[in-house]
Design a protein with these regions (language model features):
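Phosphate-group recognition and catalysis centered on beta-loop-alpha active-site segments
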Residues: 1-310
Length: 310
């Protein structure tokens, strides 16, 4: 009964409306001031603890396609070496199967944009692809094999977010072959995986459920029920409804592409665990500022809202 009385009085204090649970007594005002005092002490202590030891996780900063500020050709060893110097938490990159069942690092379904060749990665062998020149941002280099890219990332101690891109031209054993060849190394060096194809997610989880694997959702329509480690979403489609649903699970959230302070603020507000960006230095700077100069009132308000589940 004492706890009930305390809670009712606390709500009355916050709302300004009296909630009667028993006939008023002359000493009620003493209890009211006691409740106010306890509440003040509680929030002061809670606020101090929050500011001294914030319970929010620092989001991972992730390079989009292995580049930052157009520092090279996307998805190449050449750019990886430059981008790794900026020390991102992860480098997101794309992998596709070749005609001869090997793997290259390539985002586009067609080589026309980067290589000026009207062909898909699945139309050419690994040797043909790795001898093909590609151009972007004023740079020129060769298409990188996944073997070379992975080996260089490991040497640089750079963790990857490996996106598997599938196509109708892929071999039926594509994922089995990929995991048999690279799965142990991916786990050993702490790399992560993601895909728009849930078949890939299933294959990775069946191979080793300890390898983090994210399901990419291009649109926010219906909240999925999957066994994925988490979801990768385009930040502009993300909303409170999705995040509230996500909080009922143990899954995480990555967002792309965070290239402005506005998109950064939204990603932070919605509790993103990772931010994929074309501008590593901007996002890293924003993260540092958020850590070093927290706004006292904003933090207390956030904690109060979380406490009362507003």
């Amino acid at each position: 009964m004492t706890l009930t009385y305390f809670l009712v009085k606390f709500v009355s204090f916050l709302t300004g409306e009296e909630l009667e649970i028993m006939p008023r007594r002359k000493k009620d005002h003493l209890m009211r001031w006691g409740v106010m005092g306890c509440a003040s002490i509680f929030f002061a202590l809670e606020g101090y603890i929050y500011l001294e030891s914030p319970d929010t996780n620092t989001p991972l900063v992730i390079s989009h396609r292995g580049v930052s500020n157009k520092n090279g050709v996307q998805n190449t060893v050449q750019s990886l070496e430059k981008t790794a110097q900026l020390k991102p938490d992860l480098v997101e990159m794309d992998v596709q199967e070749t005609k001869d069942g090997q793997f290259v690092v390539m985002h586009d379904a067609n080589l026309k944009s980067l290589a000026r060749i009207n062909a898909t990665p699945q139309d050419l062998t690994l040797d043909e692809l790795t001898n093909t020149d590609i151009y972007e941002n004023g740079y020129q280099t060769k298409i990188s094999s996944f073997d070379d890219y992975l080996e260089r990332a490991n040497a640089l101690n750079q963790k990857l977010l490996i996106e598997i891109k599938t196509s109708k031209k892929d071999s039926p054993q594509m994922m089995d072959h990929f995991l048999e060849k690279y799965g142990a190394t991916i786990k050993k060096y702490g790399h992560q995986m993601q895909s728009l194809d849930y078949h890939v997610i299933d294959k990775v989880l069946a191979y080793d459920s300890e390898i983090p694997v994210y399901f990419i959702l291009p649109y926010n329509s219906v909240f999925p029920r999957t066994k994925a480690t988490g979801y990768t979403m385009e930040y502009s489609t993300l909303d409170e409804y999705f995040v509230n649903k996500l909080w009922t699970t143990d899954q995480k959230l990555y967002v792309w592409t965070v290239n402005s302070s506005e998109s950064f603020d939204k990603a932070v507000r919605l509790g993103a665990d990772g931010m994929i960006t074309d501008d590593l230095e901007m996002v890293q700077s924003q993260v540092t500022m958020a850590q070093d100069d927290p706004e006292y009132t904003e933090l207390l308000l956030k904690k109060a809202m979380e406490f009362f589940d507003f």
